[in-house]
A protein has these predicted regions:
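Non-globular, low-confidence helical/coil segments that flank catalytic cores
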Residues: 1-275, 295, 301
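Residues that recognize and position ribonucleotide moieties
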Residues: 129, 286, 304
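Short N-terminal "domain-start" leader segments
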Residues: 273-283
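Short aromatic-glycine-(Arg/Gly/Cys) micro-motifs in beta-strand/loop hairpins
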Residues: 282-298
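Compact, charge-rich alpha-helical regulatory domains located at protein termini
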Residues: 293-323
C-alpha cells in the first residue's frame, strides 16, 4: 500500500512535537534515524558489521518499530546493517533504489523485508509521504543511471520552515541533472554525498543547496581519504558548519519547525567508563568479560563497562566468566 501523501498540513507543526534526525555513528557508511510524532524512518543501515550495533542503538533509543526503512542504493556500506534491523524490527514500508542486486548482502535485506510481508518497493521520483507532521519527498534520481551511486534515492524532508536533504552517494553528474530538473534542492541541512568524496558535492551543487549545516558520515582513518579536503573547503567557503561522525560520534539535529539544535554524542557506541571498570568488552566479537577473566581482548580492542547489564544494552553478550 502507498503511504499517505504529504499535504500542506505538514507545514503546520504542533507545539509539542519535534523532528529529531540522528546521524548514527556507523563508521564508513550511512545510517540516519528520523523520528517525528510517533513515526520513524531509517535511511540506510551502514556496513554489515554494524548490524548488531544498529539493533542495540535502536533498542536504547526505545524504538519499537520503524514506519519507513529507506535504502538509498544497494552498496554494502548503506544496506549492510539493514538485514539485522529488519530481522528484529517490524517496518511498515521498505524502499530502495532497486529490488534486486548482485550481492548476498542486498539479497538478505530483500529476504527479511519479504518475510515481514512488506517487500522492497522502488519509490518514484515525485512520491511523497508524511512522517508525523514532517513531509518527505523523493526528488531524485531524475534519470536512470548504470552506476548505483548516481541512482541513489534523494530525499527532501521539510518540517515547518526547516529542511533536510539526504543524497546517498549521488555524484556530480547526477547532482547536475537534479539541478537541471528544477527540483528544490535548497536545504538547511545537507547529508554530504558519498561520505565527502571528491566525486560528489560540486561547487555548483553546494551553492544551490546553500546549507547552514552539513553532516559527513564517515569512518575514522578510512582507506578512501574521505572527506576530501576540496569538499571541506567548498563547504567552508559557503560558511556552512560541518559535523563529522568520525570525530564527533553521533550527530543529533532537532527541529521545532523554526529552529535547529545540534548536539553530538561521542558515547553512542561505547560508554564513557574508565579503564578500571569491572567489565571489559571485545569490540570485534561483541563479547563482554569480567576484568579478571583470562581471555581478555588486546588493549586496542577493549571497551569498558561499569555493569554487565550496560554492556548488554550496547549489544554485547556475556562471556561464560560472568555468572
Amino acid at each position: 500500500p502507498q503511504p499517505p501523501a504529504a499535504s500542506a498540513a505538514a507545514q503546520q507543526t504542533p507545539a509539542d512535537e519535534t523532528l529529531t534526525v540522528r546521524f548514527l555513528d556507523v563508521g564508513q557508511g550511512d545510517s540516519i534515524l528520523l523520528a517525528c510524532g510517533d513515526e520513524t524512518m531509517l535511511i540506510d543501515g551502514g556496513p554489515v558489521e554494524e548490524g548488531q550495533f544498529l539493533v542495540s542503538r535502536l533498542n536504547r533509543l526505545d524504538v519499537a518499530e520503524l514506519t519507513y526503512v529507506v535504502n538509498t542504493h544497494p552498496d554494502e556500506d548503506h544496506c549492510g546493517g539493514l538485514a539485522a534491523v529488519l530481522a528484529k524490527y517490524p517496518a511498515e514500508h521498505v524502499y530502495s533504489s532497486v529490488t534486486e542486486y548482485t550481492t548476498k548482502v542486498f539479497s538478505n535485506v530483500v529476504k527479511y523485508a519479504d518475510e515481514q510481508g512488506h517487500p522492497v518497493e522502488v519509490p518514484q521520483t515525485g512520491d511523497s509521504w508524511t512522517l508525523g507532521s514532517a513531509s518527505v519527498q523523493v526528488i531524485g534520481p531524475v534519470q536512470t543511471y548504470s552506476d548505483p551511486n548516481n541512482g541513489s534515492l534523494v530525499l527532501r524532508v521539510d518540517y515547518g520552515g526547516t529542511s533536510f536533504l539526504f543524497t546517498g552517494d549521488m555524484e556530480q553528474n547526477a547532482e547536475a541533472d537534479l539541478m537541471d530538473s528544477g527540483a528544490n534542492v535548497q536545504a538547511d541541512v545537507l547529508k554530504v554525498g558519498h561520505h565527502g568524496s571528491p566525486t560528489s558535492s560540486s561547487e555548483a551543487f553546494l551553492e544551490a543547496v546553500a546549507p547552514s549545516i552539513a553532516v559527513i558520515s564517515v569512518g575514522e582513518d578510512n582507506d578512501y581519504g574521505h572527506p576530501s579536503a576540496d569538499v571541506l573547503a567548498r563547504l567552508e567557503a559557503l560558511g556552512t558548519t560541518i559535523y563529522r561522525t568520525d570525530t564527533q560520534g553521533e550527530i543529533i539535529i532537532t527541529s521545532d519547525g523554526q529552529t535547529l539544535t545540534v548536539t553530538t554524542d561521542p558515547t553512542s557506541r561505547e560508554p564513557a567508563a574508565g579503564k578500571d571498570a569491572p567489565f571489559i568488552g571485545n569490540r570485534n566479537s561483541m563479547i563482554v568479560h569480567s576484568a579478571n577473566c583470562a581471555k581478555l581482548p588486546g588493549e586496542d580492542n577493549r571497551v569498558y563497562f561499569n555493569t554487565a547489564e550496560e554492556a548488554e544494552e550496547y549489544g554485547y553478550q556475556k562471556h561464560t566468566c560472568i555468572k
